[in-house]
From Swiss-Prot:
<keyword id="KW-1003">Cell membrane</keyword>
<dbReference type="GO" id="GO:0005886">
    <property type="term" value="C:plasma membrane"/>
</dbReference>
<comment type="subunit">
    <text>Probably interacts with PlsX.</text>
</comment>
<keyword id="KW-0594">Phospholipid biosynthesis</keyword>
<feature type="transmembrane region" description="Helical">
    <location>
        <begin position="7"/>
        <end position="27"/>
    </location>
</feature>
<feature type="transmembrane region" description="Helical">
    <location>
        <begin position="164"/>
        <end position="184"/>
    </location>
</feature>
<feature type="transmembrane region" description="Helical">
    <location>
        <begin position="66"/>
        <end position="86"/>
    </location>
</feature>
<comment type="pathway">
    <text>Lipid metabolism; phospholipid metabolism.</text>
</comment>
<comment type="function">
    <text>Catalyzes the transfer of an acyl group from acyl-phosphate (acyl-PO(4)) to glycerol-3-phosphate (G3P) to form lysophosphatidic acid (LPA). This enzyme utilizes acyl-phosphate as fatty acyl donor, but not acyl-CoA or acyl-ACP.</text>
</comment>
<dbReference type="Pfam" id="PF02660">
    <property type="entry name" value="G3P_acyltransf"/>
</dbReference>
<keyword id="KW-1208">Phospholipid metabolism</keyword>
<comment type="similarity">
    <text>Belongs to the PlsY family.</text>
</comment>
<feature type="transmembrane region" description="Helical">
    <location>
        <begin position="203"/>
        <end position="223"/>
    </location>
</feature>
<keyword id="KW-0444">Lipid biosynthesis</keyword>
<keyword id="KW-0472">Membrane</keyword>
<keyword id="KW-0808">Transferase</keyword>
<feature type="transmembrane region" description="Helical">
    <location>
        <begin position="104"/>
        <end position="124"/>
    </location>
</feature>
Length: 257
């Protein structure tokens, strides 16, 4: 009976409760909060008017910009990890024997809502960032190996194109599908035993389609949030970024975070 209760509660946790608190935590937009606390100004009123790292650097400097990046990355790591801790220690990591489904994979579901909260924060009139750093944090929890490849990919594309927005969109799309490649799709909270991971790829495949879908939704939202950047790139009006310095022209649309 306890096992059945834990299984039911695990579904309620991962599909209802986790998305709720993940969205609320995601809505705590670091750039807006930091700019209001330390500068008494809303970063969304200046420059690109975007609530993200790049605009924070442009408006308030590198220190607050880097702190914004760190806090945005931490948000999905916190929400997914919190869900996993509750799932494992409070509910004793139940396994739905009725269909052979390992519910551990569902702890990642809330990560999507962290990104949604960041982009559409309830605390700030649903006007948030574009989800790049949050997507990166989510990817770290889903697959650290692919996340590392993603960081390298982002930097290489940025060095070549000088467009942060384009680099972010390409990297998100690339990493989303890269998790499907056997051998590098290690999912920490699902494949808990790293030493046996490579000897049971069939087990990996059972869960990878779920996280792939979660990442696909997240990457699609990220790209959608960059719709103005896509237009700016097409008309050659997008701002160019050189690491933490930006080249700008008058009346250009926002870059990305």
């Amino acid at each position: 009976m306890d096992q059945v209760y834990n299984i039911v509660m695990a579904y309620i946790l991962t599909l209802i409760i986790s998305p709720l608190y993940s969205y609320l935590i995601g809505s705590l937009n670091a750039s807006i909060i930091l700019s209001l606390v330390f500068k008494k100004q809303d970063v969304r009123l200046f420059a690109s008017k975007n609530a993200g790292m790049t605009n924070m650097i442009r408006v308030h400097g590198k220190k607050l910009g880097i702190l914004t990046l760190f806090l945005d990355i931490i948000k999905p790591i916190t929400t997914v990890s919190l869900t996993y801790i509750i799932y494992k220690y409070a509910l004793d990591a139940p396994f739905d024997l009725s269909n052979g489904f390992n519910q551990a994979i569902l702890v990642y579901f809330g990560g999507i809502f962290t990104i949604i909260g960041h982009c559409y924060p309830i605390f700030f009139k649903f006007q948030g960032g574009k989800g790049v750093a949050c997507y990166g944090g989510f990817l770290i929890t889903v697959d650290p190996i692919v996340a590392l490849i993603g960081i390298i990919t982002l930097l290489v594309i940025l060095l070549i194109t000088k467009y942060m927005s384009l680099s972010a969109m390409i990297t998100a799309t690339f990493t989303c599908f890269l998790v499907l490649v056997p051998g590098i799709n290690y999912i920490p909270y699902y494949n808990q035993n790293f030493t046996t991971y490579f000897f049971d790829l069939n087990y990996v495949i059972k869960g990878i389609w779920y996280v792939w879908f979660f990442l696909l939704v997240s990457a699609s939202l990220l790209i959608y949030r960059h719709k103005t950047n896509i237009l700016s790139i097409a008309t050659k009006q997008e701002r160019k970024t050189i690491l933490f310095h930006t080249k700008s022209k008058d009346n250009l649309s926002d870059v990305n975070k």
